[in-house]
């Protein structure tokens, strides 16, 4: 069974960061080692919260502890999400390097959280660090639209521009870019676009966009987690993308139908593993 070290935020109540990522990956048959960068009572969009960030040095100490018992060599991938400070970002880089030195076959998938995540905003300097340092280290990245623009240093309004932006990042290091939410001026307003790009291929997929009175937090974290899990299970990029598109839609639809604010991960767990409604991806002709 594959193992992934997931370095993200955590909420006790609700689903964001590791609280949105761990269970879906486990449900898909992947062991998860959660390392929580932030521990909060709930995500901050409720208006009240309690909690704090972990010290960056302790992040490395925890991973050193795994290495000390001889288990780190079994880590097949590292997934990083919210990093609250430049010190945490640097610690994540050192952790990835340690994992890869221990297991050269391990890969790193970066969800480059640069904006407000569950109401949490990273400290100044995190965005600049991610843009400057992480593409060279990552084997894959999962930006949303605004994060893609920051990584590529350009405005993006069409699929063609998004593919070109992804390819510019791929030239820096990653093998695959998953765009978790793509705004395309040519797409219908009621559709949610996702895109995945490699050096030679690109696929786009669409699912329905639901008009939530308050949009649930953690959808992006869920998206990255499912894609990583399916890739670890051996799916091709396209197959992992299509499974992710379908499974995330199922969770979002279950949440919308239940009129909930928090993602209905447990209720929709069978759909995460075996989605009943699929949305085929198609190759884009964008160069």
UniProtKB/Swiss-Prot annotation:
Protein keywords: ATP-binding, Kinase, Magnesium, Nucleotide-binding, Transferase
Catalytic activity field: pyridoxal + ATP = pyridoxal 5'-phosphate + ADP + H(+)
Residues involved in substrate binding: 9, 44-45, 221
Keyword Magnesium recorded: yes
Entry keyword Transferase: yes
EC main group: transferase
Gene Ontology molecular function: ATP binding; magnesium ion binding; pyridoxal kinase activity
Recorded metabolic or biological pathway in which this protein acts: Cofactor metabolism; pyridoxal 5'-phosphate salvage; pyridoxal 5'-phosphate from pyridoxal: step 1/1
Gene Ontology CC: cytosol
Listed SUPFAM superfamilies: Ribokinase-like
Entry's Gene Ontology BP terms: pyridoxal 5'-phosphate salvage
Entry EC no(s): 2.7.1.35
Residues given in the record as ATP binding sites: 111, 142, 147, 180
Cofactor: Mg(2+)
HAMAP family assigned to the protein according to its UniProt record, in alphabetical order: PdxY
Known partners and oligomeric status: Homodimer.
NCBIfam families: PRK05756.1 (NF004398), pyridox_kin (TIGR00687)
Protein task: Pyridoxal kinase involved in the salvage pathway of pyridoxal 5'-phosphate (PLP). Catalyzes the phosphorylation of pyridoxal to PLP.
Family: Belongs to the pyridoxine kinase family. PdxY subfamily.
Protein name, as recorded: Pyridoxal kinase PdxY
Organism: Burkholderia pseudomallei (strain K96243)
Classification lineage: Bacteria, Pseudomonadati, Pseudomonadota, Betaproteobacteria, Burkholderiales
């Amino acid at each position: 069974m594959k193992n992934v070290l997931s370095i993200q935020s955590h909420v006790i109540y609700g689903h964001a960061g590791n609280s949105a990522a761990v269970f879906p990956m486990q449900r898909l048959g992947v062991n998860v080692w959660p390392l929580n960068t932030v521990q909060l009572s709930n995500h901050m969009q409720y208006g009240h919260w309690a909690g704090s960030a972990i010290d960056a040095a302790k992040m490395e100490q925890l991973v050193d502890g795994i290495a000390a018992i001889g288990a780190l060599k079994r880590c097949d991938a590292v997934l990083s999400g919210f990093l609250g400070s430049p010190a945490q970002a640097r610690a994540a880089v050192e952790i990835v390097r340690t994992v890869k030195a221990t297991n050269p076959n391990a890969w790193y998938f970066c969800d480059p959280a640069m904006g407000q995540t569950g109401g949490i905003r990273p400290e100044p300097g995190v965005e600049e660090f991610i843009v400057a340092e992480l593409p060279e280290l990552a084997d894959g990245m999962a930006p949303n639209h605004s994060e893609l623009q920051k990584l590529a240093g350009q405005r993006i309004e069409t699929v063609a521009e998004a593919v070109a932006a992804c390819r510019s990042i791929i030239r820096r290091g990653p093998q695959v870019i998953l765009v978790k939410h793509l705004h395309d001026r040519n797409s219908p307003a009621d559709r949610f676009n996702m895109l995945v790009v490699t050096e030679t291929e690109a696929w786009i997929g669409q699912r329905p966009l639901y008009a939530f009175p308050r949009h649930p937090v953690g959808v992006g974290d869920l998206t990255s987690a499912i894609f990583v899990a399916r890739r670890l299970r051996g799916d091709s990029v396209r197959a992992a993308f299509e499974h992710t598109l379908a499974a995330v839609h199922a969770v979002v639809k279950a949440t919308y139908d239940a009129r909930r604010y928090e993602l209905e991960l447990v209720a929709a767990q069978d759909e995460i593993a075996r989605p009943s409604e699929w949305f085929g991806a198609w190759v884009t002709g964008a160069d």
